[in-house]
Amino acid sequence: MKNLLPSPISLLFFLSLTLFSCGQTTPSIDFDHAECAHCRMNVVDRQFGAAIITLKGRQYVFDDVGCMIQHVGSGTIAESQVANWYVCDHARPGVLIDATTARYVNGPGFRSPMRGDAAAFATEAERTIALQEKGGEELDWKQLREVLKP
């Protein structure tokens, strides 16, 4: 009778498949078709979109960072259930970056869809250029959440 136990190599293969399939990936936003999870408007502006991924892997998209902060702040999704926060890089429309490490400018020169008026940047140099062109206040993630909280 053949040995019915799997080989160690096949066990490692299936274990690695299981582990990697559970990993969080960067979300994608279907601009012009996706609906903001908070305000239900279509997500159209590639400079201001935002998204979260929960610990269970569910993706929520938002038309600006203010909607994302207010949605979680209102308790609709428990903050403890958010695995990753993302925002669109204002300098590279449609490209999602880590919201917790992004550099922000908040001011009326940045007319975001729901008037949070906050723009995210991947680099300090890009934020500096935006500040010179449009003005506003420099913020980090913690400060931005305080300004835009519900």
Features from the language model and the residues they span:
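C-terminal partner/receptor-binding element of secreted or periplasmic proteins
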Residues: 122-150
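Short aromatic-glycine-(Arg/Gly/Cys) micro-motifs in beta-strand/loop hairpins
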Residues: 48-53, 101-113
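C-terminal motif of bacterial Sec signal peptides marking the signal peptidase cleavage site
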Residues: 18-21
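Post-signal-peptide N-terminal segment of Sec-exported extracytoplasmic proteins
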Residues: 37-75
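Residues immediately within or flanking Cys/His clusters that coordinate Zn2+
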Residues: 33
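Bacterial N-terminal signal peptides that target proteins for export
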Residues: 1-11
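Mature extracytoplasmic domains of secretory-pathway proteins
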Residues: 61-97, 104
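Bacterial signal peptide processing site
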Residues: 23-25
